Design a protein with these regions (language model features):
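Exposed, interaction-prone extracellular/peripheral surfaces
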Residues: 350-354, 374-388, 405-408, 414
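Active-site donor-binding acidic/aromatic loop of nucleotide-activated sugar
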Residues: 420-424
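Catalytic-core elements of nucleic-acid end-processing and repair enzymes
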Residues: 431
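Helical hairpin unit composed of two closely spaced alpha helices linked by a short loop
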Residues: 358, 368-390, 394, 399
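Phosphate-/nucleic-acid-contacting segments
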Residues: 361
Length: 510
């Protein structure tokens, strides 16, 4: 009589999520107990931990690493000398991911010739635009393309029907890569088409981040996909053990169809992204669809990731479609990726370059604001030289402490002339920049330490493309729905100021 409820009870408490959380919590508790037990009254242990923090500080000073990231960790180790060095080794150091690094670097090097910048593709760009494009081609290894149409979507529910139509038309390949995949209306619609296409012989592959999707997928998800002939990789699987590589998440959002059509942006495969589920008011997001030669960059981006973990092919030429007989003349489209496993901060540099070249305006969508002094100075200096710099952030947060951290940056920016808005209808999740009617970026890259330094990310740089104006118009249409923040709104109590200081200190961990 009680058997069914008991089975349901134990299946609920013994699922993968619960086991992972409980075991990690026990490990953290044990480490804290060991830390306090060893340090209490043991001068030599305290001295050893302080020496470790000092050595890590010296290591960071000499390391070829982004200055904002280094300063954040050095400050933390200075304030917490007993814990700082150990925290850096656990959560900040990229070196432990050697196996991950070697796999990805080997594939990237093997396929460098698949992405070579052709001079005619950047013809017509002015000096500053050419400089931005050249940087991405040389250091990001992703070239610029002409002959590509782009379409900007101002929300997930506008993008979703077009995505389904494109998936239905797939004839050869469908490559899907997302940080979050959750069961629900959005995923059900995509999955039904993927299953049908796989049954028709289309090469269907899926990469999803195991941490991002942990709460939203059944434990046998991979088995189900493979049975449906959908090849599947859960990236960096979450295990109930404290691991130094768990920081590195696949935050990218990519769909590539037949090598000709690609999608990216902030939209994941979960119901809140198309407002089929209300979590934090209206979910404001953005996405970009490209069709044409530039989709090849996303094809290589996906295949490099795929073959690093599940080697399938050494020659990508079969996935490259023929050039269109009807070329599109709509500026430059330049997809790019950023990896935490090298020393080149591609995503941050693209943002800094946009600020440096701006003459009239820079409009920014970002759900989070947790950046270093270099980015803060760039924002302030642009405003001080007369550029209309506007930041749009959420009015309803998804993470309250991170929201408080974001707000802690408001005052110095406002004092420099940056204008800041909070989107009052709900949560703004878009990650977009647009400047001077000339250039724009749409992608997965937040303005925080995790996106800029720890996650795998992607985006698209548009120059002299019609969708630059579409993004500009979207921002201008969104501003009346926002509350503009003024200096008088930033007053806080002494305890609040102390809390903000602590959050800023801990920002590399958030």
């Amino acid at each position: 009589m009680f058997r069914l409820p008991i089975v349901k009870f134990f299946s609920r408490i013994l699922n993968r999520i619960t086991i992972t959380v409980v075991l990690v919590a026990l490990q953290v508790a044990w480490l804290l107990w060991a830390f306090f037990s060893l340090t209490t009254g043991r001068v030599w242990v305290n001295a050893g931990l302080q020496l470790l923090s000092l050595l890590m500080m010296l290591y960071l000073v000499r390391k070829d690493e982004n200055s904002a990231y280094k300063i954040g960790w050095i400050a933390l180790m200075g304030v917490l000398p007993l814990l700082g060095g150990a925290l850096y080794l656990s959560f900040g150091n990229k070196r432990p991911a050697k196996q991950l690094r070697s796999k990805l670097q080997a594939v990237d090097e093997a396929h460098r010739a698949d992405l070579v910048q052709q001079p005619d593709q950047v013809a017509g760009l002015d000096a500053s635009g050419l400089g931005m494009s050249r940087y991405l081609a040389r250091y990001g290894r992703y070239p610029a393309w002409k002959n590509t149409a782009a379409q900007y979507f101002a929300c997930g529910e506008a993008m979703y029907p077009q995505l389904l139509r494109d998936l239905e038309r797939a004839e050869h390949t469908i490559f899907v890569e997302y940080f979050i995949v959750h069961t629900g209306k959005m995923w059900d619609g995509v999955e039904a088409i993927l299953r049908r296409k796989a049954a028709q012989g289309v090469d269907v592959r899926l990469i999803y981040d195991d941490f991002g999707s942990l709460l939203g997928l059944p434990t046998d998800f991979v088995v189900r996909m493979e049975r449906a002939h959908i090849r599947c990789i859960p990236f960096n699987p979450v295990v109930p053990v404290l691991s130094l590589v768990m920081n590195h998440r696949d935050h990218r959002k990519i769909v590539v169809i037949d090598g000709r059509i690609a999608y990216t942006g902030g939209v994941n495969l979960a119901d809140e992204y198309i407002n089929a589920e209300q979590r934090f008011g209206y979910w404001k997001d953005a996405a970009l669809r490209i069709e044409g030669d530039a989709a090849w960059s996303f094809t290589v981006m996906f295949l490099n990731f795929w073959n690093a973990f599940r080697p399938s092919e050494t020659d990508y030429s079969a996935f490259r479609p023929q050039h269109s007989a009807h070329p599109v003349q709509d500026g430059i489209v330049q997809p790019y990726a950023d990896s935490p496993l090298d020393e080149e901060p591609v995503a941050e540099t693209v943002y800094l370059n946009l600020l440096a070249r701006a003459e009239q305006y820079v409009y920014i969508y970002t759900p989070y604001l947790a950046v270093g002094e270099e980015m803060l100075d760039a924002l302030k200096n642009a405003a001080k030289r007369g550029v209309d710099v506007r930041l749009v952030l959420p009015g309803i947060p998804d993470k309250k402490l991170v929201f408080r951290l974001s707000r802690s940056y408001y005052l110095p920016l406002l004092q420099a002339g940056v204008r800041i808005y909070e989107y009052t209808p709900g949560f703004l999740h878009a990650k977009c920049w647009v400047s001077d009617d000339r250039a724009a970026v749409v992608g997965s890259i937040n303005m925080d330490y995790r996106s800029l330094f720890l996650h795998f990310e992607c985006g698209v740089l548009l120059q002299h493309n019609s969708q630059v104006a579409a993004l500009r118009d979207d921002v201008r249409a969104t501003l009346p729905q926002c509350r503009e923040i003024h200096i008088s709104d930033c007053r806080t109590s002494i305890p609040g100021t102390l809390l903000d200081s602590v959050l800023r200190l801990l920002s590399p961990l958030m």
